[in-house]
Amino acid sequence: MVFTQAPAEIMGHLRIRSLLARQCLAEFLGVFVLMLLTQGAVAQAVTSGETKGNFFTMFLAGSLAVTIAIYVGGNVSGAHLNPAFSLAMCIVGRLPWVKLPIYILVQLLSAFCASGATYVLYHDALQNYTGGNLTVTGPKETASIFATYPAPYLSLNNGFLDQVLGTGMLIVGLLAILDRRNKGVPAGLEPVVVGMLILALGLSMGANCGIPLNPARDLGPRLFTYVAGWGPEVFSAGNGWWWVPVVAPLVGATVGTATYQLLVALHHPEGPEPAQDLVSAQHKASELETPASAQMLECKL
């Protein structure tokens, strides 16, 4: 009897009671899954000379990765996976502003770590493809496996607009999916529909710079490549492109949130919502599981 109870007791000691800590762990794992699968698809295509992957397979893998990542952490952290979406959730009141920098830090750290995992996984393939010469530009460049870079014709102004518009479309779509006063999505299928949204964006807006739309997805891997052997050119390439996929998605998230709220959400009839959205349900469940003292601490945070 003692032996059968031991695993349960151990699990009880390991269980984390803090809501914020659980959210951080779930967000870290979700971003890690997203990045490893997305970068793996790109690495497979690039290092094989596109004999084992292409433009379509990269975006398909990325959309499926988003779906899986949301299932991983959706009911714990909300599976934001993206500082731009976290910002949108703060704007609409679904995430406390005080948690925004914490979410962003976790997302950046996870993207950095996932890039390291991708590098280790494809280390031999990278060495074979490049001959040990890791470059940011040129016919054998491999930096784009990890971070995004603009097409040769793309100006910074057009690239900035690309990211504002693309992220705005992303946020409009996500808010519509989560809006129970609108058409809505059957419970549990939200991740699938979000994956379809990502695929549509990739296939329609991916040519200019690969639709980063996510500051953590771009900056975390870029920092990794800087320290892993690609050097400072990861920041100077594309006329100093690096800041565009960091700043523009945040602008796009603000624009997209304001657009959906002003044109759709604000005009719903007054009254209770038909059903709780994924994030609200998660918070309610967390409150029921969290002791009163922990809830007080959460409020202070």
Curated annotation (Swiss-Prot):
Instruction: Tell me what organism the protein belongs to.
Output: Homo sapiens (Human)
| An MF annotation (GO) of this entry | glycerol channel activity
The protein in question is named Aquaporin-10
**Tissues where the protein occurs:** Detected in epithelial cells on villi in the ileum, and also in stomach, jejunum, colon, rectum, white adipose tissue and placenta (at protein level). Expressed in duodenum and jejunum. Highest expression in absorptive epithelial cells at the tips of villi in the jejunum. Detected in subcutaneous adipose tissue.
* Single GO BP term: water transport
Keywords of the record = Cell membrane, Glycoprotein, Lipid droplet, Membrane, Repeat, Transmembrane, Transmembrane helix, Transport
Its PTM note reads: N-glycosylation at Asn-133 increases the stability of the protein but has no effect on its activity.
Q: Which PROSITE patterns does its entry note?
A: MIP
Gene name?
A: AQP10
